[in-house]
Amino acid sequence: MNRTDFLQTLRDALHMLPMDEREDAVNYFGELIEDKMSDNGCTEREAIDSLGRMDEIVASVMDARTEHDHAVPHTEPVEGANEQTSHGIKTVTVKAAAVRQIMIRGRNCPIEISRGGSEEIVLRYLQDEYRQIDFSLEQGELRLIQQPQTLFSLFGIRQLFSDKSFITLTVPAELAAALDAQTSNSHMQMDGVSVWGALRLSTSNSSISVTSASAKAMDITTSNGRLTAEGLQASGPITLRTSNARLEAHQIEAGEALTLRTSNGKIVFSELNGTGITMHTSNATVDGSLPHAANHYSVTSATSNGSNTLKHHAHQGPVPLDVRTSNSAIRVSFTDNA
């Protein structure tokens, strides 16, 4: 049984529930299957089999529906952190000097990262009986982990729609730490921060925007959503990736390789620098200008059913340039040739 058939069978088996609660349950198990496949590296069939028999699943849904204990789990205060809660919004303040690594894991939750004061790291997020987010600070590692939605909490999903989840992170302009932030199905944005360690930002099925930022190395990824990057600098490699969407990159400076990848989406760029530059897409145009003269680059390029301004590039310069697409044009110019 595949996922579509399984979810339809579950929908039919829960016919006694109101339509909104029935769909909440179906959506919950759809996400649970995706999580199992991602976390355990298993197939769709294996993830479905691990859920148990259909009658057991239906019974667990009905048991969760009758549960009335809505107490928010008690959490112990974290040493070195000042925590405040108001109207379900939790604010955690930490001395920046105590942090060397920041890890954030959200779910279906937008993340915004911005520049604040010079001495503190501030986290704000929504936490209630339907959303459990665990905060910890140990040996210089700050962790904020949003737990998977429980079966019990799915019947509070009406509140989830009225009170939107979010995570905001405010850090010093010069953050003496590495930063790794991930979410899913939600927008991510970062502006005006210099990260002394590596920077990794990831989401899915939504856009991601990073501006005026620097780091030791950068890996910025989404899927099925636009990626916008401007004013980025890294002493190491920079990788920008999305799929089925447009990728825009301007004023990007990598001390090592610079990679731009998407599919079924246009790549628009200007002022890119790296020891090697790769730009790959499909079914869309690659369009922009590079610094220096044409003889600064050694070019590999390919397209189909489209024009290619790099087709007759014969120079053997110090910087490898690899540009590929399909069913569309490659239009690359060089500023020193203008």
Model-flagged regions — what are they?
Residues 26-38:
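Amphipathic alpha-helical segments that form the core helices of the histone-fold
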